[in-house]
């Protein structure tokens, strides 16, 4: 599941020298949000536009900022980058309409133009892919994951483990 965007999570990752990409939802760490929003217009060189999807109808605009200094509630200092993808394309639920989706991540990777797409797809959006191709199949594809078969915590763990094996087969 996703990491919580906050200083303690970053501190743990940094202590073990782990790289991270943490979803940065609106309202999480307002200081980082404000810094990113104020620096993006000043750094037009940190922008990339990419067309994808059927007939290239989906437009992805990437913006990134490196070296944002952040001091968390525990007074630990962090230097982070922020990567954002604003995706505009056809809305599959409303034909003829455009859907805009914003993805934003906090990371300790140094963001460069050559790696932005790879980080977004392999780091940031892989969780989305796992959820859609994995958990949604388990919930809606005949595995009945949401059904409460038991209230015993051990039994439900065993059930879920067996469901994972069945899904892999």
Map each language-model feature to its residues.
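Short, conserved catalytic/metal-binding motifs centered on acidic residues
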Residues: 1-5, 20, 105, 130-135, ...
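Acidic, metal-coordinating catalytic cores used for nucleic-acid/nucleotide bond scission
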Residues: 2-6, 26-29
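Short Gly/Thr/Asp-enriched flexible loops that form oxyanion-binding sites at enzyme active sites
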Residues: 5-14
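Glycine-enriched alpha-helix->loop->beta-strand junction motifs that scaffold or abut catalytic
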Residues: 15-19
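An anionic, glycine-rich sequence signature occurring as long contiguous blocks
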Residues: 21-127
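Short amphipathic alpha-helical "interface-anchor" segments enriched in bulky aromatics
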Residues: 114-149
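Basic, amphipathic alpha-helical segments enriched in Lys/Arg and hydrophobic/aromatic residues
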Residues: 140-169
């Amino acid at each position: 599941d996703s990491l919580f965007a906050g200083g303690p999570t970053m501190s743990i990752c940094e202590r073990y020298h782990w790289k991270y990409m943490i979803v940065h939802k609106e309202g999480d760490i307002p200081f980082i949000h404000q810094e990113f929003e104020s620096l993006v217009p000043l750094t037009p060189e940190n922008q990339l536009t990419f067309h994808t999807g059927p007939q290239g109808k989906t437009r992805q605009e990437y913006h990134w900022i490196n070296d944002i200094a952040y001091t968390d509630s525990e007074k630990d200092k962090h230097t982070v980058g922020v990567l954002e993808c604003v995706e505009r394309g056809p809305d599959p639920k409303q034909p003829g309409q455009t859907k805009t989706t914003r993805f934003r991540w906090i990371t300790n990777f140094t963001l460069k133009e050559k790696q932005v797409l790879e980080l977004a797809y392999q780091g940031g959006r892989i969780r989305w892919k796992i959820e859609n191709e994995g958990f949604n199949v388990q919930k809606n594809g005949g595995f009945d994951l949401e059904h409460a078969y038991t209230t015993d915590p051990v039994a439900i763990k065993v059930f879920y483990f067996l469901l994972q094996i069945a899904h892999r087969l």
